[in-house]
Amino acid sequence: MVKEYKTITQIAGPLIFVEKTEPVGYNEIVNIKMTDGTVRRGQVLDSSSDIVVVQVFEGTGGLDKDCGVIFTGETLKLPASIDLLGRILSGSGDPRDGGPRIVPDQLLDINGAAMNPYARLPPKDFIQTGISTIDGTNTLVRGQKLPIFSASGLPHNEIALQIARQASVPGSESAFAVVFAAMGITNEEAQYFMSDFEKTGALERAVVFLNLADDPAVERIVTPRMALTAAEYLAYEHGMHVLVILTDITNYAEALRQMGAARNEVPGRRGYPGYMYTDLATLYERAGIVKGAKGSVTQIPILSMPGDDITHPIPDLSGYITEGQIVVARELHRKGIYPPINVLPSLSRLMNSGIGPGKTREDHKAVSDQMYAGYAEGRDLRGLVAIVGKEALSERDTKFLEFADLFEDKFVRQGRNENRTIEDTLEIGWQILTHLPENQLGRIDNKYIQKYHPAHRKAK
């Protein structure tokens, strides 16, 4: 028998506090019956005492203490079906594209199940994004979680859409899909995302979840879990390689802070909840490859660093959980370079597992290391030139200074719709390395110089 409680004791922000007489489950879905007969949905946040804390998805405006509360005994579920592909949904899974509701094959708990560490396989297959600074120097590997650290005013949304359009697993027979979840975005950004997916045809292999800035903060906490549940369904039920792009994790963390404040929790660093690390881990750790499963889940969470501060708790904690970072730099953006990715502080910890013979090319690691070394030295020399002038540099130093400019102009810079293969990326790398004297290519084995260096290929 379903019981309806009329025991709301307090309404605070997006939360209601309900007195209970029977056990209630954590994350349980709640139906709130308004006095005018309409029904709102909520979710149990805390059931440890006689007072249950419920977050209301549609907000508490118009609620009063006479409203009825029904505990359903169910958690929030995603209606999962292969028909999810090609759809644009709200942050809580309702259609936003004017289409019909999804007819589910399964109803899946959005909180997911913990992945058995013993069943995890180490990531080892290359994912081609078509962006040289990622593919060439900070390679994304299937099953990896590799965040993009950006900042306000930088083109991380454009980079996210470019990756969503272009990403593929070369040589794989399994289908590839993208799950794109945007949190706390403006109506203008939502229109931009929707039109880009539809215009470029990328929507055919994508599932898009959009949570707007004026949607309840509660929905923002649900959105990435909806997206990851959809990704797991496509990966493990349909054998697809799924790339999940989550933007912007900073808006998600702000919603966590807002909910924590409404519950009068003791704040942690900079006002964020003390459990934020654990909460972020419940999202990031859902990436991976499971033994015996054909599909896989790869994650690119995107976060904007408040005040360009990489030590801020959100990027700081994300860095501990994930396997590297791609750093978007304001300095390169000011120069008009797109994508403005600074490879020096960027890192892909699993890169070596996904490159080399049979995956990309035998010279990939050597070319990447040499470009890193040359660019780092060229950047250092820019600081020296600012003090002593270019005339004081030796011929060798001048070559490295020019190499840094070439690297930014030819390798980093590319068009918003330019999809480079890994062969294109390595070829551009070799072309700019010809600017350095051959005796300075100390990080590249001589056999690769003989085989791939443009000067030697012409001689043959």
Curated annotation (Swiss-Prot):
HAMAP family hit by this protein: ATP_synth_B_arch
UniProt topology in membrane: Peripheral membrane protein
Biological process annotations from GO: proton motive force-driven plasma membrane ATP synthesis
This protein's record includes keyword Transit peptide: no
Entry keyword annotation includes Nucleotide-binding: no
Subunit and partners: Has multiple subunits with at least A(3), B(3), C, D, E, F, H, I and proteolipid K(x).
UniProt cross-references to NCBIfam families, sorted A to Z: ATP_syn_B_arch, PRK04196.1
Pfam family, one: ATP-synt_VA_C
GO CC terms: plasma membrane; proton-transporting two-sector ATPase complex, catalytic domain
Subcellular location(s) of the protein: Cell membrane
Purpose: Component of the A-type ATP synthase that produces ATP from ADP in the presence of a proton gradient across the membrane. The B chain is a regulatory subunit.
Keywords of this entry: ATP synthesis, Cell membrane, Hydrogen ion transport, Ion transport, Membrane, Transport
Sample GO molecular function, one term: proton-transporting ATP synthase activity, rotational mechanism
Similarity comment text for this entry: Belongs to the ATPase alpha/beta chains family.
Protein name: A-type ATP synthase subunit B
